């Protein structure tokens, strides 16, 4: 889709025209314009629109017999005109401006159409869609391989397969009733409808021939997008061929079929006339080129109308709500299996539900969770459920469960799209204050996320639309109108919904959830109501809705509960440091060393020294507390007024995050800014080349692999690093090879998708304040830790507690930035200095409290309440003049006060308004495009304007101030490096384009090869060295734990559609399908957290108390732990147990890979055993990779 060659200038070939009389035809207008202005290719004249304040009413199927009105506000006649050459559009605009365009005595108004790159116009004209007109479309369900149930049918549909934008469209016309608020009558208007899907959303295509023509059956991964616009246009074309669409908006809507066919059915049967045979063949060739899977049809399926064909459904979501004798937990999982497409609704008979009624709850939960991991449809639900239940009963080890930490909760999720909803299997997540308090009813909480079809981010264009610019000019109507999708969302928020026998009501949301378009709902019971929960949370006195909502959301921040700190131990009156209207201490307080150590103990952190700062929630306070020497006055926590957000009596200190080693990576925004500030392109190129060289050597050179793991993977690389250092080799140890391969491909993915280049002399650091007041303006203090895997063995007894505290004080110029950073002034150049009084602070960025303006505020308008900053002290990344560009002014938007207390409906309205107006992602993407296309880069005027808009958008959750994206700044073309496959792209010649193309081919080849690579389970090597005498006694217990662990891990792989376990265990995830979400980062973080919780849970199981442990010496304990680790290894790697493990993965499938990560939960003890078996002569003490072996060998 990229246009190679030079970028052609953007041109306007379209205009919108109004002011002519109602009797004017498209041909008359065309003839006049060709005489006065220039050749016209197409003229589309409109006299209809969606009446303001109305919505399509799809409950009315037959519009011929309803009372209709014609007295709604009509639109002035207007036309959309495409000229042959762009000069004609300019001439028309000029002539109208001078009142020289007069038709039938009436002066015409002209509005310029969209500005499009010349190459885009040309490509649209030369890329011909494969149009199969007059087809019959049947939307239904492939109930079995031989039966197709039709839910909805339409004739005279046009089917377009369009390589221009890689879409398929079903287009047809339909009379539609529009309803008005508080009105009985309806307006009846003809509308054009469009069902649009991306070619990549077609899972399979089947094709066969009948006596009447050809048939395609398209199996979709998700529902198509539904659009409409008013029809009966008078169209006059003077040339054949396709043109770019004009300004007349297509409006998103919901499922218009009364039977809910678009939402619940993903099989589309297309009946095509024999005269389109050649076009059909070409379209199928295009599908093959796009790698759509083609399935052979041995014989055509039987076609029948579904039971209850044509009967309206009132269900918002297409769920099976309640069955007598079946609990909510089971019904939710049944719907999860149904929504995943494993079973279809016609298979869920009473026989199926009787199977569930006749088995214990734990068997049913395990069975349905297992079925949720299936990737393909199953056509006999009863038979498969029975098979899985029997298999689980034969293997009771799959049923056990471990008590979860109080910081972990099992969360149910519901995803709501414009046409349907999806129940997602419960996920283990970090808990929050509310869930911990209401633990007894925790399963009545539901996380609801609003998304577009294909699990894409729902954006403002789905929820609202503007009329065409010419209509604005003619009617002075510049308002945006809400779509029917918005009405659906708003009714769900306001009225709640029923699900599996429960009624759910809106509760609240955190700041992260607001960005994620999600919120908490709660199903009230007789004892606990939504109002009770909100009363317990605290007193929220803000009269600004945005601020009040944000503060309620603090109770839903994901946190660890640690120490109960009594009010008399907390100073809440510490004054803020204020100057020139700025708060230099905004969001930061202090914590005493003894309390900081207590918190670390509660968190059970695997670190050798206490974090020096924590991001916290305490009562109604939020922010960061930095470790600072105690004043011996009994005060353990000092909190400033800027940290106080609401009143609460809650006294548990809750932790969101803490300072730790976090490797530094560049990204596209930072590269764009550093480049415009004068850092040469060759610097970024050389840094990427160095990274590529190491990644290409990672599987063959243990020294390089060890360096990559310890320097760029943080704690997620520890297991693989320990294995390398102990002497395990990637060539003979498949799990180690898999982990290294995942790190390599995921980092290549980061380079391709985000230009995520590793910076050796760089970190991501939490911002803190110089409480001592020593640093001057323009200075900072940075002390960073270096990774040391020896510290992973500190629990192995006193001989191993000698920790390496390897700290480095950074000196010299540093560049800092915080995401998002769009303005050149967002990169601050500071001088890092050594201050002995601050040596107790490490892995954080200490800012001065002196100066006219806080450096935090200069950097993207940030503060000190937990923001992370990219910091680089590699002098090659410092701009040549060693100075900061003038910072943008980040003045807080004026707050709107209601003049009264904020109520529940205000919060709902605010959430809905955010959904309809969220623009930050759009603005940031537009900034990338304009910076790439302009010779001035990020200093281009349009980029500076976008930076201002982004700053306002970032603050929307706090201020409620809406930002709108100017139409002229919306990109029409995207640079190739943005990977916008579904849009028009061009080849970028700037540094980001060069970096992208350098790595793209490497990544594509490696990802494909890695997808196909698998270890033959029968060829997994077994290392007998790891057998410790007496391990046999622990095998039964080890096997039970492995069954449970593997079951949960396989569930995560299936739920997130990730291919390999090594991706999850290293946190380097690369195989998640693109259609899952545009915001893959958020999904990956959730997956990482789910796995970390799982790993922590089983590490706790591993370390569970040994009998008579109090009477055992450290060495005796270690020997017992080594036996346990040996048993865990044996049930994972021994051929006999590998075979058993594969049998447990699925009762009747044999295509799975052996799961190996369970053994390495005890990697530290397996490393001890391995190192003892090595000859000391083979350990090179000078090599970093052998440092651990030497360290342990001296102590074992």
UniProtKB/Swiss-Prot annotation:
Effect of inactivating the gene: First leaves are elongated and curl downward. Presence of stigmatic tissue in the middle of the septum at the apical end of the carpels. Altered post-transcriptional gene silencing (PTGS). Accumulation of ARF4 mRNA (targeted by TAS3-derived siRNAs). Upon infection, over-accumulation of CMV RNA and enhanced susceptibility to cucumber mosaic virus (CMV). Reduced levels of TMV-cg-derived small RNAs.
Keyword Zinc-finger applies: no
Catalysed reactions, semicolon-separated: RNA(n) + a ribonucleoside 5'-triphosphate = RNA(n+1) + diphosphate
MF terms (GO), sorted A to Z: DNA-directed DNA polymerase activity; RNA binding; RNA-directed RNA polymerase activity
Phenotype for residue 860 to F: Alters post-transcriptional gene silencing
GO CC, alphabetical: cytoplasmic ribonucleoprotein granule; nucleus
Gene Ontology terms: biological process: defense response to virus; gynoecium development; leaf development; maintenance of shoot apical meristem identity; recognition of pollen; regulatory ncRNA-mediated gene silencing; regulatory ncRNA-mediated post-transcriptional gene silencing; RNAi-mediated antiviral immune response
Pfam families linked to this entry: RBD_RDR6 (PF24572), RDR6_2nd (PF24577), RdRP (PF05183)
Annotated phenotype, changing residue 825 to E: Alters post-transcriptional gene silencing
Keyword RNA-binding among UniProt keywords: yes
Subunit structure: Interacts with SGS3.
Protein name, entry field: RNA-dependent RNA polymerase 6
Recorded name of the encoding gene: RDR6
């Amino acid at each position: 889709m990229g246009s190679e060659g030079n970028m052609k200038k953007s041109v306007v070939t379209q205009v919108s025209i109004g002011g002519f009389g109602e009797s004017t035809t498209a041909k008359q207008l065309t003839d006049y314009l060709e005489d006065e202005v220039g050749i016209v290719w197409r003229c589309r004249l409109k006299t209809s629109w969606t009446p303001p304040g109305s919505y399509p009413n799809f409950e009315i199927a037959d519009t011929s017999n309803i009372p209709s009105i014609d007295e709604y506000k009509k639109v002035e006649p207007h036309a959309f005109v495409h000229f042959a050459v762009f000069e004609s559009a300019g001439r028309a605009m000029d002539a109208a401006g001078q009142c020289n365009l007069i038709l039938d005595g009436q002066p015409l108004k002209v509005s310029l159409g969209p500005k499009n790159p010349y190459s885009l116009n040309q490509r649209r004209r030369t890329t011909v869609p494969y149009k199969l007109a007059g087809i019959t479309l049947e939307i239904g369900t492939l109930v079995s391989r031989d039966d197709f149930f039709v839910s909805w049918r339409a004739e005279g549909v046009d089917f377009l397969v369009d390589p221009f934008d890689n879409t398929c469209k079903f287009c047809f016309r339909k009379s539609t009733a529009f309803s008005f608020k508080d009105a009985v009558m309806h307006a009846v208007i003809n509308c054009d409808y469009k069902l649009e899907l991306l070619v990549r959303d077609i899972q399979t295509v089947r094709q066969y021939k009948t006596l009447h023509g050809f048939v395609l059956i398209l199996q979709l991964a998700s529902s198509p997008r539904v659009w409409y616009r008013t029809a009966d246009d008078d169209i006059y074309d003077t040339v054949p061929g396709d043109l770019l669409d004009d300004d007349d908006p297509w409006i998103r809507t919901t499922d218009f079929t009364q039977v809910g066919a678009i939402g619940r059915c993903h099989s589309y049967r297309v009946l095509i006339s024999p005269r389109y045979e050649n076009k059909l063949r070409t379209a199928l060739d295009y599908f093959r080129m796009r790698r759509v899977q083609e399935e052979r049809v041995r014989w055509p399926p039987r076609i029948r109308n579904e039971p209850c064909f044509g009967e309206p459904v009132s269900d918002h979501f297409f769920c099976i709500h309640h069955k007598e004798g079946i609990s909510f937990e089971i019904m939710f999982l049944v719907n999860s299996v149904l929504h995943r497409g494993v079973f279809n609704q016609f298979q869920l008979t009473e026989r199926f539900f009787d199977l569930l009624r006749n088995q214990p709850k734990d068997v049913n939960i395990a069975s349905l969770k297992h079925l949720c991991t299936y990737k393909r449809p199953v056509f006999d639900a009863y038979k498969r459920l029975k098979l899985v239940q029997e298999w689980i009963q034969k293997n009771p080890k799959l049923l056990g469960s471990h008590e979860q930490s109080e910081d972990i909760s099992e969360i149910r999720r519901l995803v709501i799209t414009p046409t349907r909803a999806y129940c997602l299997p419960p996920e283990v997540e970090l808990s929050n204050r509310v869930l911990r308090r209401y633990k007894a009813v925790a399963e009545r909480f539901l996380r609801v996320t609003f998304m577009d079809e294909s699990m894409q981010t729902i954006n403002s264009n789905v929820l609202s639309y503007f009329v065409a610019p010419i209509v604005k000019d003619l009617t002075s109507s510049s308002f945006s109108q809400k779509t029917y999708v918005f009405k659906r969302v708003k009714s769900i928020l306001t009225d709640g919904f029923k699900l599996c026998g429960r009624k759910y009501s809106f509760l609240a949301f955190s700041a992260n959830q607001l960005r994620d378009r999600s919120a908490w709902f709660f199903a009230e019971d007789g004892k606990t109501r939504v109002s009770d929960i909100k009363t317990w949370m605290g007193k929220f006195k803000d009269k600004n809705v945005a601020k009040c909502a944000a503060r309620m959301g603090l109770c839903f921040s994901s946190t660890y509960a640690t120490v109960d700190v009594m009010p008399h131990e907390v100073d809440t009156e510490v004054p803020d440091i204020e100057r020139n209207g700025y708060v230099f201490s905004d969001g930061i307080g202090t914590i005493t060393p003894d309390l900081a150590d207590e918190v670390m103990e509660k968190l059970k952190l695997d670190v050798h020294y206490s974090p020096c700062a924590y991001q916290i929630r305490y009562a109604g306070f939020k922010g960061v507390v930095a470790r600072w020497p105690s004043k011996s006055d009994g005060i353990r926590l000092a909190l400033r007024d800027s940290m106080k957000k609401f009143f609460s009596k809650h006294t548990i200190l809750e932790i969101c995050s803490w300072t730790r080693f976090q490797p530094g990576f560049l990204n596209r925004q930072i590269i764009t800014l550093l480049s415009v500030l004068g850092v040469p392109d060759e610097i970024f190129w050389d840094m990427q080349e160095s990274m590529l060289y190491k990644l290409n050597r990672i599987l063959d050179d243990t020294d390089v692999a060890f360096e990559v793991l310890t320097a760029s993977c943080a704690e997620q690389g520890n297991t693989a690093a320990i294995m390398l250092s102990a002497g395990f080799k990637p060539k003979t140890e498949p799990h180690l090879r898999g982990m290294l391969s995942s790190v390599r491909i995921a980092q290549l993915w980061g380079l391709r998708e985000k230009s995520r280049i590793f910076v050796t002399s760089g970190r991501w650091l939490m911002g803190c304040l110089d409480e001592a007041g020593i640093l001057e303006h323009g200075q900072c203090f940075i002390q960073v830790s270096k990774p040391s895997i020896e510290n992973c063995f500190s629990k192995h007894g006193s001989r191993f507690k000698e920790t390496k505290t390897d700290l480095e004080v950074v000196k010299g110029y540093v560049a800092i930035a915080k995401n998002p950073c769009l303005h050149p002034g967002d990169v601050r150049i500071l001088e890092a200095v050594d201050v002995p009084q601050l040596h107790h602070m490490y892995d954080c960025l200490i800012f001065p409290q002196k100066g006219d303006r806080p450096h935090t505020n200069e950097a993207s308008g940030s503060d000190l309440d937990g923001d992370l900053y990219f910091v680089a002290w590699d002098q090659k990344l410092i701009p040549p003049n060693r100075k900061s560009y003038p910072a943008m002014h980040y003045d807080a938007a004026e707050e709107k006060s209601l003049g009264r207390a904020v109520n529940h409906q205000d919060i709902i309205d605010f959430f809905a308004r955010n959904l309809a107006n969220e623009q930050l992602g759009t603005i940031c993407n537009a900034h990338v495009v304009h910076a790439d296309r302009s010779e001035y880069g990020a200093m281009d005027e349009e980029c500076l304007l976008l930076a201002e808009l982004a700053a306002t958008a970032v603050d929307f959750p706090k201020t409620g101030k809406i930002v709108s994206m100017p139409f002229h700044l919306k990109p029409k073309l995207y640079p190739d490096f943005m990977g916008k496959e579904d849009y028009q792209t061009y080849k970028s010649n700037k540094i980001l384009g060069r970096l992208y193309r350098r790595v793209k081919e490497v990544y594509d080849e490696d990802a494909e090869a890695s997808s196909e690579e698998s270890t033959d389970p029968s060829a997994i090597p077994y290392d007998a060295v790891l057998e410790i005498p007496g391990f046999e006694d622990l095998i039964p217990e080890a096997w039970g734990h492995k069954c449970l662990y593997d079951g949960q891990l396989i569930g995560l792989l299936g739920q997130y559609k990730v291919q390999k376990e090594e991706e999850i265990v290293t946190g380097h995830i690369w195989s998640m399908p693109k259609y899952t979400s545009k915001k893959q980062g958020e999904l990956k973080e959730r997956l990482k957290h789910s796995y970390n919780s799982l790993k922590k849970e089983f590490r706790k199981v591993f370390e569970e108390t040994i009998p008579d442990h109090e009477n055992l010496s450290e060495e005796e304990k270690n020997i017992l732990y080594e036996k346990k680790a040996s048993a865990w290894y044996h049930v994972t790697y021994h051929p006999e147990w590998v075979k058993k493990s594969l049998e447990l993965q699925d009762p009747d499938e044999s295509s799975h890979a052996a799961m190996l990560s369970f053994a390495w939960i005890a990697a530290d003890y397996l490393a001890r055993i391995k190192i003892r078996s090595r000859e000391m002569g083979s350990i090179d003490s000078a090599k970093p990779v052998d440092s651990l072996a030497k360290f342990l060998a001296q102590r074992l």
